[in-house]
């Protein structure tokens, strides 16, 4: 008996019965194996007779193919080879990994142009398709606001005290001459002449206008914020048939009236002023758009807000023009004024929900502010105005918010997680982001300097949720009092400072006590 015969003559392993398989499958496999072995014996014998080397031919391993098996056990997890009728986990379509909204290499002229840079957004409304992919002034979800009635009836709405013919059509709104009314002076229209565009966003355009008669020096130059209507509202004829139209109209109307009512009630040096409107109905009616649709059924009439004008532009553009090199005293002064503005809002039960560098406007350039340091005007004059109240909300005591809104670089982890959040603490989180950015010339949740490709591939929302930030420029400054604010705001909500705690910190309090306008 040769070595191959001795192998095949070994006792066979007992065959075990397997649940769920036909009894004959083992017999078929065994028969196939014996047939193969028989053929292999003949081949090996022939080879051995010619070469004399029994090690030249390896054994053949036979694998059963289970031709007669009709069904296999259900897999525990989904794999690419699983049957097509298995259900898979739903794919998350709401990724917050949105392309970067800015570049440090941008020229100042580009920043001051009409087209603004792309910006990352957190919003539960999709931006209109026919508009540029800039920051979305998102409308709150219906969980925070009630919808209008299913039918639009003129009996349900308030009649406006005065309806100016000059603003009854969109075409007239595009002229270089703009007619508007100061708040509570509806009987005296004023005329302004367009100078140039200032900026543009997904839901508004801002233009600079000059008063034509020069009768009031304070109104010589104003910023006119012109509302853009979403694409869903372009076809007014759908008002009685489209549920989507009614819901979009309701959200826009709620957001617009809330912003106007809040701005009308505010009076603080460091907050932008609402001076007037192109049509009084926008501030006198609870449902101005529905009222105006009845009067002008073919198109929504324009809404132009007359705002105070800040000639030096926004803080982000000014910082980038300096390549991020700001003196410590200047950072401390500007941040103190921002804190004063937010403190005033919170004391009046208003949350902003969109605090960021772009929404802080400068009344004077940095060079002008520096020239004021040794003069009495330095403590008597405010240098910034907080703007863009499109996402603001007046809330009750201990009220929690649910709308996921804001700009992704500045939103708190609880907003990203989609859980109810304290709007006051979401504002103080954003203040921490602002102060860090002024200190470090970078956003705290951007990829770190000299980051690897893997680190850069992580979404900003991922770093925010992990509180993944650190100091770079100020890493060696252990006694910087401003660092204390950042470290106590970019943290968990149960440890996060309130606006009063920020105000009482030495970094803010020492400057605030010297200001006479606050």
Swiss-Prot record:
The modification N-acetylmethionine is found at residue 1. PROSITE patterns: PROTEIN_KINASE_ATP, PROTEIN_KINASE_DOM, PROTEIN_KINASE_ST. GO terms for molecular function: ATP binding; protein kinase activity; protein serine kinase activity; protein serine/threonine kinase activity. It comes from the Eukaryota. The keyword Signal does not apply. Residues 16-45 have a biased composition (Basic and acidic residues). Its main location: cytoplasm. It is an enzyme of class 2 (transferase). Keywords: Acetylation, ATP-binding, Cytoplasm, Kinase, Nucleotide-binding, Pheromone response, Phosphoprotein, Serine/threonine-protein kinase, Transferase. It is found in: Cytoplasm. Signal peptide: none annotated. Present with 1510 molecules/cell in log phase SD medium. This is Serine/threonine-protein kinase PRR1. It comes from Saccharomyces cerevisiae (strain ATCC 204508 / S288c).
